[in-house]
Amino acid sequence: MASGQQQQGRSELDRMAREGQTVVPGGTGGKSLEAQENLAEGRSRGGQTRKEQMGEEGYREMGRKGGLSTGDESGGERAAREGIDIDESKYKTKS
């Protein structure tokens, strides 16, 4: 009985996704429930891979810079204007 309810719930989520709603966190742009699940998994895995390549410090520093960006200027421009130190040497990938 539980699997019938699960299937019904998935069908409802799929219908909503096909109508253009995002039903899976990170699944923005997917045209079906399965597509949104795949997008979310890929985005999560991509971020994890970058974190492993750059190391935790570099990944955190990159996030600081990205968080400073606005519609008018990049994070680097804003950091320079406001005198915020961003240590880009931490970005180097591990070899």
Curated annotation (Swiss-Prot):
It holds the Pfam family LEA_5. GO terms for biological process: response to abscisic acid. Induction: By abscisic acid (ABA). InterPro entries: LEA_5, Sm_Hydphi_plant_seed_CS, Small_hydrophilic_seed_prot. Residues 40-64, 75-95 have a biased composition (Basic and acidic residues). Residues 1-95 are annotated as: Disordered. Expressed in dry seeds and immature embryos. Residues 1-10 have a biased composition (Polar residues). Belongs to the small hydrophilic plant seed protein family. The induction of Em proteins by abscisic acid may be mediated by the cis-element, termed the ABA-responsive element (ABRE), which binds a Leucine-zipper protein, Em bp1. This is Embryonic abundant protein 1. It comes from Oryza sativa subsp. japonica (Rice).
